[in-house]
């Protein structure tokens, strides 16, 4: 069943599916995630129970920020599909940099992202210079999720729109050639097959274990 565009996403389900997908298909991600968890464990030992922002609060906030990106990118994917249908010549986003069609500047000014990153920044501010230097694994892990996650969310929503818009827009017809070009471009970017790419499903029906 098709789910509501914006409000149906469950943070736990989204993260579970994204992380599981990347562990299967993204080179270096499994090691990056392992290093991230080791870094968090080190910080727990160093900070103890006296931290103003705990490691667990930091971990949750970091993933909240990622989820904010995913939701916004999914919205943009739905919108891009309709924009392309209405005016394909003016809305071929495959010809521009992903930073443009994912609107990263706007994504990182959204209230949910701001709230989450305020907590992230507060956590870093309490670290000593030595501990800050030991957080490269966090930066690497976050970079993996921020680089790939929004692209996958945008693509997933774009394809979902192909089957949803005919139900609500008279005369709508999905552009199969453009959809194929999109999935081919993204699969090539990730170094995977189109079949592997289409295993992604970040809606609320995905259940985390």
What residue spans do the PLM features occupy?
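Intrinsic-disorder/low-complexity detector
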Residues: 1-193, 204-209
């Amino acid at each position: 069943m098709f789910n509501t565009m914006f409000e149906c996403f469950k943070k736990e389900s989204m993260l579970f599916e994204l992380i599981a997908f990347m562990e299967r298909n993204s080179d270096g991600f499994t090691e990056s995630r392992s290093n991230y968890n080791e870094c968090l464990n080190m910080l727990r030992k160093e900070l103890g129970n006296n931290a103003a922002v705990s490691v667990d609060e930091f971990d949750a906030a970091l993933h909240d920020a990622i989820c904010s990106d995913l939701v916004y990118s999914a919205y943009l994917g739905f919108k891009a599909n309709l924009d392309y249908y209405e005016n394909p010549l003016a809305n071929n986003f495959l010809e521009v940099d992903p930073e443009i069609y994912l609107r990263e500047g706007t994504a990182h000014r959204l209230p949910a992202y701001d709230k989450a990153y305020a907590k992230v920044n507060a956590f870093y501010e309490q670290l000593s210079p030595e501990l800050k230097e030991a957080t490269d694994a966090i930066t690497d892990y976050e970079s993996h999720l921020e680089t790939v996650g929004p692209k996958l969310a945008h693509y997933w929503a774009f394809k979902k729109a192909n089957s949803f818009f005919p139900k609500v827009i008279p005369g709508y017809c999905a552009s199969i050639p453009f959809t194929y070009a999109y999935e081919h471009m993204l699969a090539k970017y990730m170094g995977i097959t189109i079949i592997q790419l289409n295993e992604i499903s970040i809606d609320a029906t995905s259940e985390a274990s």
